[in-house]
């Protein structure tokens, strides 16, 4: 777990099954800043699902296609551990 948190944007990492489904809390890659979840096509492009996000000073909100992502947000993302690592290491 610690190795995953050292690199990339991951803030927290929960492996639900060894090498399989994983949930991470992470800063969004720059390419998502200013775009909605729908516009960024995270699931189809990267194979991971954004479940929700936390904006500074705001409560957790479940993500919808219309959820706008900013640089200060923290995303809650789930999927295959390998795909999540790739997504978290994007610039």
What is each residue range found by the language model?
Residues 28, 33-91:
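Cytosolic Rossmann-like ligand/nucleotide-binding regulatory domains
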Residues 1-33:
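Flexible, Lys/Arg-rich cytosolic regulatory linkers and terminal tails that connect or flank
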């Amino acid at each position: 777990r610690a190795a995953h948190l050292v690199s990339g944007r991951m803030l927290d990492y929960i492996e639900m099954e060894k090498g399989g489904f994983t949930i991470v809390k992470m800063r969004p890659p720059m390419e998502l800043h200013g775009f909605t979840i729908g516009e960024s096509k995270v699931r189809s492009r990267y194979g991971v699902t954004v479940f929700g996000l936390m904006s500074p000073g705001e409560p957790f909100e479940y993500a919808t296609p219309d959820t706008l992502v900013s640089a200060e947000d923290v995303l809650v993302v789930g999927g295959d551990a390998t795909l999540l690592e790739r997504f978290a290491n994007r610039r």
